């Protein structure tokens, strides 16, 4: 066609030079090219009488192609400009010439449409009135409908451009528009749609000038409201909705706002009247309109064959559309919407159900019309929500009840159809879900959808029903329907056998006629509405609802990806798959506070969703992955994080002052040179706690004896959010060791502790910690330390604690377990020659897992705080909840310790009551005084003789300090300087131990307690007496700071919450390497030797730490073994 345009220009154009060889060289210039094209179009349409050669293509044959040529010309840009005025002038003359002839009017209108859109302002103002007169002449002529349609389209563009120019606006309004409307009103019936298009343009761009003909226009519009042509009816409704804005500010004595409200009330009154006529004697309690509106006088149908109910329904539909358009269209002045009256009409329509209709007479016809009336009411409700927005919130309860009511009314017969068939009433249900999405989109979480109540449960049930794919089912049926399987009374006959139902459900899907995309519209609408509701109201929705959605969505996504439900399900449609992924993302972004989101499963689903055939679905999955990645791995740390991240290793700075509502800031410890990087075990669990260090990839190395961070607990992890740690519990010179793997030294300052070279701690072997984690939070969650010296060590993590990190490298006993009220003890002075070692960076705090049930005799004392100076405390630890170490394989020893604790409880009771109030004051006063010191110890391995001498010396010094306390040493042993009263013994049930010969289960919980002001005295230590026969079975638990988990536990046989007295000296006990069990036994043999001197101390302090119920039989105290 382009070649024909160019050839026509060179053949017939007077200015043929541009078409020659010289003109083609200038095609690169934009204005020159447009001028060439304009002249080519002119040449095609000009007569060829003067040409010596007969034209190959007569002009009349270009008429069908002329609209396409105009569109092609517009692709090259605007034709306006000073350089094209001559060509445009030629086109104007050509257009006027063609409009004057009946045979060439269509070509003239095509050129006029190009001139109106492309001419500059000056040219448009000069020729606009003449063009309007030409169009009016075309409308008055009885031309073909196609010419009339093109003339109205050109008129719409001309009025739109003329309304922007004040001079033309006044001229056309005063002199031309009334005549133009009269011409449109007089068009033939077959041109009514074109006439309505022209009237709509007039009332839209020149509403004031149409006021004089408002009455005639209203009658014309009303007469077309019940038209059977949907396009004609829609145009009539759009025009009628603009009637209140016609005329001046006081149209017929009424303001525009008053006119709008009066028209609205008239529509409401007429709709109530039509509804009464449609369903007379079927409504249980008909509601009459009480508004000020006057019923419209609608003309009766001239067709006597049309049923009156069908005519009434068509009028009702037209008036309802007019009401909705008045609500949704823009109006030039603020108006008052009678919300209550509109809602009354909507409720009256939706209140009519099939149960109220009598099926005799015209009842079936009324039942046939009812769904369409409900659809009109739902459209009206949607327009009302759009018009009023969140101001409808006070009617939110009514709207929340209406939606499930409509779904219940149109849910019959939906479960009896085979897959591949469209379920009945899907259009109504789709509209209900669209209104649900709109209502939540407008009002947000205030909409109150799915937030409990009978209506919320009913709505959720319908949503899940429409989202779930259909399933094939076979059912047995009896041939005669008898309950006895065919054995009926009367004449004897052969027994009848049950047969399968021979319905369509029996046929396999491949042999069944059906629609592969059946019910996809209602499914996609339900998914959109549910996704929007979860996204906006997710945290307010019940936990059970979230779990139900998880149980449905996750398997459904997997089935869709594996192609298991794509036979005749709605998920063959890409819209439904997109809605399913959108719902899954909403469940991630707005989870319930009590139901963790399925993050791991969703990440896998989105990853697989990127391979979808549909580009829209795969693009959404890619965007969802980016969103999830931004949530799980933010590129920058958040401003207020619940737990500290792991920055680059750095020395331990002094701790910050604690806050009352959050844990102290995280202080990154130093580098970790001894242990290699910890391998990662896989993605995060979906619903369980965050994996600990053992299951996360580490960028650095873990040292053999790292110090805990400022807010670390005995697991080497920082305290969970909103837990304030007193300063005495933070690492300092008085309550922190550099090694963190040895016991605290309770000797006076000046006694250097023994040291152990880092390479000898593990016998030159680099340990690699490993953990086994469960992905779900269950009551039986355990962490198994695979690197410990014995394979039977299992650590149960109770509620409120994060998972266990790698344990310290030195095999020292665990911190003592408190059983009484918080006890304070003076801090241990720092060693002069102690050497600071870099500490390990702590991992972020994981969420606390639930408490697992103990499988042995468990005695849980009340949650207490542990004193910092107790043996095995390993320096200060962060606050945790019940510190209790339980060995389920030594029930006899537990009974002995309980008896001893009960004996000493009475001795210490009086003194505890006197110092109860002092402890509370000192607890807060000592917070700022005891965070300035830090102890660091190193042990040397292989020098057992040196250790014996140092143990004796340090134990002597501790004994002098403990027995030298003024007036506080009682017969049973020295109590701490300030002791609050012990709690009464709690009768905790004992569980019978399991018949497990080897594995020992340790329930380890820790809650550090307050300390006294720093001083030369140290807290008396409490340790149970350990029989010599139990020495070799003793399990050494590393001190709580950090380190690999292989040194945490060995064969746990220690009594609950008590430690051996021999380890009191801190660095006196050397952990043997895993390769030398003989040295380990020798080291353990020397542990109970110093207990002979400290037996009385142990007895004195038992009641202050553990309250256990007394037992009937009390075995004699065990004798101390000789070293």
Curated annotation (Swiss-Prot):
The modification Phosphothreonine is found at residue 751. A motif (LXXLL motif 6) lies at residues 264-268. A motif (LXXLL motif 11) lies at residues 585-589. GO terms for biological process: cellular response to estrogen stimulus; positive regulation of transcription by RNA polymerase II. GO terms for cellular component: cytoplasm; euchromatin; MLL1 complex; nucleolus. It comes from the Eukaryota. Residues 780-792, 891-962 have a biased composition (Acidic residues). GO terms for molecular function: chromatin binding; SUMO binding. A motif (LXXLL motif 4) lies at residues 155-159. The modification Phosphoserine is found at residues 13, 478, 482, 755, 1029, 1039. A motif (LXXLL motif 3) lies at residues 111-115. Transiently sumoylated, preferentially conjugated to SUMO2 or SUMO3. Sumoylation causes nucleolar exclusion of PELP1 and promotes the recruitment of MDN1 to pre-60S particles. Desumoylation by SUMO isopeptidase SENP3 is needed to release both PELP1 and MDN1 from pre-ribosomes. A motif (LXXLL motif 7) lies at residues 271-275. Residues 646-657, 803-829, 840-865, 973-987 have a biased composition (Pro residues). Keywords: Acetylation, Activator, Cytoplasm, Nucleus, Phosphoprotein, Repeat, Repressor, Transcription, Ubl conjugation. Residues 2-80, 121-189 are annotated as: Required for modulation of ESR1 transcriptional activity. A motif (LXXLL motif 5) lies at residues 177-181. Residues 639-767, 779-1123 are annotated as: Disordered. A motif (LXXLL motif 8) lies at residues 365-369. Widely expressed with high levels in testis, ovary, uterus and pituitary gland. A motif (LXXLL motif 9) lies at residues 460-464. A motif (LXXLL motif 10) lies at residues 580-584. A motif (LXXLL motif 2) lies at residues 69-73. Coactivator of estrogen receptor-mediated transcription and a corepressor of other nuclear hormone receptors and sequence-specific transcription factors. Plays a role in estrogen receptor (ER) genomic activity when present in the nuclear compartment by activating the ER target genes in a hormonal stimulation dependent manner. Can facilitate ER non-genomic signaling via SRC and PI3K interaction in the cytosol. Plays a role in E2-mediated cell cycle progression by interacting with RB1. May have important functional implications in ER/growth factor cross-talk. Interacts with HRS, RXRA, SUMO2, HDAC2, RB1 and STAT3. Interacts with PI3K, SRC and EGFR in cytoplasm. Interacts with ESR1, the interaction is enhanced by 17-beta-estradiol; the interaction increases ESR1 transcriptional activity. Interacts with CREBBP and EP300 in a ligand-dependent manner. Forms two complexes in the presence of 17-beta-estradiol; one with SRC and ESR1 and another with LCK and ESR1. Interacts with histone H1 and H3 with a greater affinity for H1. This is Proline-, glutamic acid- and leucine-rich protein 1. It comes from Mus musculus. The gene is Pelp1.
């Amino acid at each position: 066609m382009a070649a024909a345009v160019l050839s026509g220009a060179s053949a017939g154009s007077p200015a043929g030079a541009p078409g020659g060889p010289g003109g083609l060289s200038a095609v690169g210039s934009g204005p020159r090219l447009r001028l060439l094209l304009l002249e080519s179009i002119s040449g095609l349409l000009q007569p060829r009488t003067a040409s010596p050669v007969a034209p190959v293509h007569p002009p009349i044959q270009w008429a069908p192609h002329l609209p396409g040529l105009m569109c092609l010309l517009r692709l090259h840009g605007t034709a306006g400009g000073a350089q094209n005025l001559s060509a445009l002038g030629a086109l104007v003359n050509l257009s006027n010439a063609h409009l004057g002839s009946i045979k060439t009017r269509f070509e003239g209108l095509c050129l006029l449409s190009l001139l109106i859109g492309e001419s500059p302002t000056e040219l448009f103002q000069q020729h606009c009135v003449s063009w309007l007169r030409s169009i009016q002449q075309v409308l008055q002529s009885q031309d073909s409908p196609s010419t009339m349609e093109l003339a109205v389209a050109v008129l719409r563009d001309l009025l739109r451009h003329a309304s922007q120019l004040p001079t033309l606006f006044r001229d056309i309004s005063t002199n031309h528009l009334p005549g133009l409307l009269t011409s449109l009103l007089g068009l033939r019936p077959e041109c009514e749609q074109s006439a309505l298009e022209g009237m709509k343009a007039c009332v839209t761009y020149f509403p004031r000038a149409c006021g004089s003909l408002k009455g005639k226009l209203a009658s014309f519009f009303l007469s077309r409201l019940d038209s059977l042509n949907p396009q004609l009816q829609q145009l009539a409704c759009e025009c009628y909705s603009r009637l209140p804005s016609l005329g001046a500010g006081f149209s017929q004595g009424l303001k525009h706002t008053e006119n709008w409200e009066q028209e609205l009330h008239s529509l409401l009154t007429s709709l109530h009247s039509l509804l009464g006529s449609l369903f007379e004697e079927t409504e249980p309690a008909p509601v009459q309109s009480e508004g000020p509106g006057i019923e419209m006088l609608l003309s009766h149908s001239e067709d006597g064959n049309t049923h009156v109910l069908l005519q009434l329904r068509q009028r009702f539909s037209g008036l309802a559309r007019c009401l909705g358009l008045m609500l949704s269209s823009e109006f030039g002045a603020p108006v008052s919407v009678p919300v209550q009256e509109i809602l009354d009409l909507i409720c009256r329509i939706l209140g009519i159900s099939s149960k109220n209709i009598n099926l005799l007479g015209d009842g079936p016809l009324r039942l046939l019309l009812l769904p369409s009336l409900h659809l009109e009411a739902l459209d009206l409700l949607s327009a009302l929500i759009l018009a009023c927005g969140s101001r409808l919130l006070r009617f939110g309860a009514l709207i929340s009840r209406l939606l499930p009511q409509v779904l219940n009314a149109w849910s019959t017969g939906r479960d009896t159809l085979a897959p591949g068939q469209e379920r009945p009433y899907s259009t109504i249900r789709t509209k209900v879900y669209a209104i649900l999405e709109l209502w939540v989109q407008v009002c947000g979480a205030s909409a109150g959808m799915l937030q409990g109540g009978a209506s919320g449960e009913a709505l959720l049930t319908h949503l899940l029903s429409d989202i779930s794919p259909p399933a094939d089912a076979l059912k047995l049926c009896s041939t005669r329907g008898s309950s006895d399987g065919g054995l009926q009374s009367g004449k004897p006959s052969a027994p009848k056998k049950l047969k399968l139902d021979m319905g369509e459900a029996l046929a396999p899907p491949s042999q069944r006629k059906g629609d592969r995309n059946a019910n996809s519209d209602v499914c996609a609408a339900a998914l959109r509405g549910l996704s929007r509701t979860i996204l906006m109201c997710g945290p307010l929705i019940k936990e059970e609802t979230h779990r139900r959605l998880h149980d449905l969505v996750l398997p459904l996504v997997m089935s869709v990806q594996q192609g298991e439900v794509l036979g005749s399900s709605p998920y063959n449609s890409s819209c439904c798959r997109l809605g399913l992924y959108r719902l899954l993302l909403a469940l991630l972004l707005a989870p319930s506070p009590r139901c963790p989101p399925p993050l791991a499963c969703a990440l896998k689903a989105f990853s697989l969703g990127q391979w979808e055939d549909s580009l829209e679905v795969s693009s959404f999955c890619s965007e969802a992955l980016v969103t999830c990645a931004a949530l799980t791995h933010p590129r920058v740390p958040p401003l207020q994080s619940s737990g500290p991240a792991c920055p680059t290793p750095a020395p331990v700075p002094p701790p910050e002052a604690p806050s009352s509502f959050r844990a102290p800031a995280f202080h990154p410890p130093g580098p970790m040179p001894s242990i290699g990087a910890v391998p990662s075990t896989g993605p995060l669990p979906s619903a369980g706690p965050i994996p600990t260090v053992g299951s996360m990839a580490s960028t650095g190395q873990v040292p053999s004896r790292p110090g805990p961070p400022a807010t670390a607990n005995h697991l080497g992890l920082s305290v969970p959010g909103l837990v304030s740690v007193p300063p005495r519990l933070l690492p300092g010179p008085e309550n922190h060791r550099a090694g963190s793997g040895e016991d605290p030294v309770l000797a006076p300052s000046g006694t250097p502790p023994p040291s152990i070279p880092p390479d000898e701690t593990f016998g030159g072997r680099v340990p690699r910690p490993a953990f086994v984690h469960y992905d779900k939070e269950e009551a039986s969650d355990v962490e198994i330390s695979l690197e410990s010296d014995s394979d039977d060590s299992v650590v149960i993590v109770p509620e409120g604690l994060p998972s266990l990190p790698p344990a310290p490298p030195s095999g020292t006993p665990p911190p003592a377990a408190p059983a009484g009220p918080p006890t304070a003890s003076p801090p241990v002075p720092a060693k002069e020659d102690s050497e600071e070692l870099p500490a390990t960076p702590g991992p972020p705090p994981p969420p606390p897992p639930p408490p697992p049930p103990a499988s042995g005799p468990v005695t849980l004392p009340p949650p207490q705080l542990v004193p910092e100076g107790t043996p095995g405390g390993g320096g200060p630890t962060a606050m945790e909840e019940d510190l209790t170490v339980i060995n389920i394989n030594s029930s006899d020893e537990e009974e002995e310790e309980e008896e001893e604790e009960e004996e000493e409880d009475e001795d210490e009771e009086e003194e505890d009551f006197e110092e109860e109030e002092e402890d509370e004051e000192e607890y807060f006063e000592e917070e700022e005084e005891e965070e300035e010191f830090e102890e660091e110890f190193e042990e040397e391995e292989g020098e057992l003789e040196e250790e014996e001498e140092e143990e004796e010396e340090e134990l002597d010094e501790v004994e002098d300090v403990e027995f030298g306390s003024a007036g506080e040493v009682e017969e049973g042993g020295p109590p701490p300087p300030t002791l609050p009263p012990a709690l009464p013994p709690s009768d905790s049930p004992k569980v019978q131990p399991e018949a497990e010969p080897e594995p020992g289960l340790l329930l380890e919980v820790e809650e550090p307690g307050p300390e006294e002001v720093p001083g030369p005295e140290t807290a008396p230590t409490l340790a149970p007496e350990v029989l010599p026969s139990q020495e070799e079975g003793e399990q050494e638990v590393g001190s709580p700071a950090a380190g690999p988990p292989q040194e945490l536990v060995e064969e746990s046989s220690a009594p609950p919450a008590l430690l051996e007295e021999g380890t009191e000296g801190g660095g006196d006990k050397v952990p043997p390497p895993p390769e030398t069990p003989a040295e380990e036994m020798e080291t353990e043999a020397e542990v109970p030797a110093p207990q002979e001197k400290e037996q009385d101390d142990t007895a004195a302090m038992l009641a202050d730490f553990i309250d256990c119920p007394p037992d009937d039989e009390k075995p004699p105290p065990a004798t101390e073994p000789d070293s």
